[in-house]
Amino acid sequence: MKKVLYVDCCIRGEESRTKKIADAFFANLCDQYEVKHLDLKNENLKPLVNDFFDEREKLIAEHNLTHPRFRYAHELADVDMVVIAAPFYDLSFPSLLKIYIENCTVDGITFASTSTGLKGLCKATNMYYFTSRGGFYHNAADEQATPYLKHLCNFLGIDHFDYIDADGMDVVD
């Protein structure tokens, strides 16, 4: 059975409009995929700073890529599809998602540095991004999340990126 990684960064939990969109998507996938639901607000994610960063760099230099701290990278590299649900915050997405991404991008697991440049190593062929926004930002230059995630796909070797954005949810005319 194919595997999906559901990266849930819906800070408001069940009240999240973004989560409701993602849940509707998953209602149609339940029989086709084994879904790993990763609720980021319940994970003990750490930003890559100070000793935590130094330890990571040392492990990578030693080629110790089986260390437990690389769990998120291995999960991401080994699935057939990635679904990210995150609301629109400050022109992008919540910082928790960025911290997660920093912990996933590991040379030798999700990408490789080669003599011809970087090569994505992720098995997934599709990434889907679901978001909701209070205002209207679809294809706006100010909206930074969608282009960032699209570039991340290319970096990780994921061929297809698509998104659903629910805009104008707080606009009252």
Where are the regions that the model predicts?
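N-terminal beta1-alpha1-beta2 submodule of the flavodoxin-like/Rossmannoid cofactor-binding fold
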Residues: 1-86, 91-102, 106
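A short helix->loop->beta-strand "cap" motif at the edges of active sites that frequently abuts
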Residues: 2, 123-126
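Short histidine/acidic/glycine/proline-rich micro-motifs that form metal-
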Residues: 11-13, 134-137, 170
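Hydrophobic residues at beta-strand termini and immediately following loops
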Residues: 38, 130, 164
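Short, well-ordered beta-strand core segments
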Residues: 82, 127-128
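Short, acidic/small-residue loops that bind anionic groups at enzyme active sites
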Residues: 104-119
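Short, conserved loop/helix-junction motifs that constitute active-site signature segments
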Residues: 118-124, 156
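Glycine-rich phosphate/pyrophosphate-binding loop and the adjoining helix
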Residues: 138-173
